[in-house]
Amino acid sequence: MKVLILNAGSSSQKSCLYEIPDDALLTEAPQPLWEGKVNWTQDRSVAEIEVKTAGGETLHESIYGDSRQAHVTYMLYTLSRGTTKVIGQLSEIDVVGHRVVHGGQNYRNSVIITEEVKQAIAKLSNLAPAHNPAALEGIEAIEKSLGDVPQVAVFDTGFHATLPDAAAIYPGPFEWVEQGIRRYGFHGISHQYCSARAAQILGRDLASLRIITCHLGNGCSLAAIKNGRSIDTTMGFTPLDGLMMGSRSGSIDPGIIVHLMRQSDYSAERLDYVLNKASGLRGISGVSSDLPQVIEAITQGNYRAQLAWDMYVHRLRSGIGSMLASLGGLDVLVFTAGVGEKSPGIRQAACEAFGFLGLKLDPEKNQNNPVDIDIATADSTVRVLVIHTQEDWAIAQQCWHLLNR
């Protein structure tokens, strides 16, 4: 079975092609046959296309035109044309899987995409304006290029559908619940993959483990996982809630928003920009939303950069503590995504606060670019894993299961 994956972002569209045996799902992620990416520059009419194959062929090209859908279609053509050709024709693809950030209340599981599903994704775009419209662009590009090939939507909110009401419902008027205003949670594909991978690495039954997964990238969230299910998470109604992030504020006193609207004449659009694009590491440090650049500024004595680091660590520790309370104990702590996988300093700072649990980090393992390994000491009562999140493979697995039911 040939499975094509599209993972849409606000400024990029990533894609890869897997070949999976029809009769048995592989236990570990295989190398994709082909990987493609469209990056949009500040000029919307210019797209940077990057393609590489398992055989080592690469393509870097700039293309012009106002249609993002056309740019994605061009990227897909490189699957069956030119030096990056890995299949004879696009019709060889059996199924296409899409990461869809927001599925709302109605989509708890992966589904075959229909017109009804597309309309629901579009309707939820106001809750994920940077991502749901981009997912629709990818879906429509596939319809144009591959016709009626089955397409599957895998929702980032789906894994958190098991949150108990006490964790999911906000303490506002009950009318909010009736309006669908609740904690949905995000990064669910990553949290679910990493919890299952942690159990696999440790040789343990997932249902027996109490796990906290820390997805720390430009966007950051934690999940508390018990019996293989999400029972608490830090992101909420939107991906703006929870931890301090690269350019997002995370949780703040809602009274600040009321104050700014009254005293400073902030519009909804300006608030949206400030909280999503000009806060977090970027807003506090004044340097960057990228943690390595903030760390570099710290070495040069930049006070605001140091403050940004300290706040990031404080809020991460507080979030882990909150998840710990929901679980009633902890067996495994997982770090994943760009910061989680690549920043030994953040892992060390986070773990230092939980020595009272008997958690002990192995300094050498932590510093040695760990991937899919346990970096706790042998006598630590909590296992600490660094896992390379593979959302694309997790989506491919969902596609395989749907088509083999």
Curated annotation (Swiss-Prot):
Kinase keyword on record: yes
Residues at which ATP binds: 14, 215-219
Top-rank EC class of the record's enzyme: transferase
GO biological process, one term: acetyl-CoA biosynthetic process
Gene3D superfamilies assigned to the protein according to its UniProt record, in alphabetical order: 3.30.420.40
Annotated pathway: Metabolic intermediate biosynthesis; acetyl-CoA biosynthesis; acetyl-CoA from acetate: step 1/2
PANTHER family assigned to the protein according to its UniProt record, in alphabetical order: ACETATE KINASE, ACETATE KINASE-RELATED
GO CC annotations on file: cytoplasm
EC number annotated for this UniProt entry: 2.7.2.1
Organism, scientific name: Trichormus variabilis (strain ATCC 29413 / PCC 7937) (Anabaena variabilis)
Species lineage: Bacteria, Bacillati, Cyanobacteriota, Cyanophyceae, Nostocales
Function: Catalyzes the formation of acetyl phosphate from acetate and ATP. Can also catalyze the reverse reaction.
Cofactor annotation: Mg(2+); Mn(2+)
Family affiliation: Belongs to the acetokinase family.
Annotated binding of Mg(2+), by residue: 7, 391
Key word Metal-binding present: yes
Keywords (A to Z) from UniProt: ATP-binding, Cytoplasm, Kinase, Magnesium, Metal-binding, Nucleotide-binding, Transferase
Compartments in which it is found: Cytoplasm
Self-association state and partner proteins as the record states: Homodimer.
Transition state stabilizer, annotated site positions: 187, 248
Chain sites annotated for binding substrate: 99
Active site annotation, chain numbering: 156 (proton donor/acceptor)
Protein name (Swiss-Prot/TrEMBL): Acetate kinase
Domain of life of the source: Bacteria
Chief localisation class: cytoplasm
